[in-house]
Amino acid sequence: YKKRIENFKNNPIGYDKIVLLGNSITEGGGDWNKKLNAENVVNRGISGDITDGILNRLEEIVYFRPIAVFLLIGINDIFNSDKPEQDKVTVKYVANNIIEIADRIKSKSPKTQVYIQTVLPINRELFFESAGYFPEHKIPLNIQIIEINKIIKNIASQRNHQFLNLHTAFIDDKGRLSSEYTTDGVHLNDNGYSLWAELLIKHIRVLNNN
């Protein structure tokens, strides 16, 4: 985490940029310019990041007043949320934080378009196969993810944020992250990144043509 922040300091965002903000799922996309056929997209994903982490590092983002920010965050918050010290991390807490991130960006950089992307589904069986364990949850993770997405959808439109439903495109017929798009039930493979890029590219084109 610290190394990545250090890297950001040495390679500032710059002006007239589009920022992809999130956790390892965003970071794992590497050079998004190639994927999105653009020259001004900056990857600000940090592996393991949570909504509170993003709230703490927004200064760097708003300083450069980007054209747009595409936010995808939340899975790490709830992944281990059944640990005793994680009591406060409820579906509502995570959803409110996501909206708070978008609100703060907008209040400090009013011309920035904020795109809130839905939390992606997970595939418990594939994760277990890959990692050999899966944390226990009183409420299944995919149910929590759907709840978070519902809340952010309802509030996003009221607050003038854009809402991008990625979730539907990535699920299989059992409502899990489709094995076609994932390496381990949580992270994306090349097919997953291609699909995501496909869903973003039209928005990137419009933003860059304005």
Question: Each predicted region: which residue ranges?
Answer:
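Alpha-helical cap/lid subdomain in secreted, periplasmic
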Residues: 34-39, 55-210
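Serine-esterase "nucleophile elbow" of acetyl-processing enzymes
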Residues: 1-70
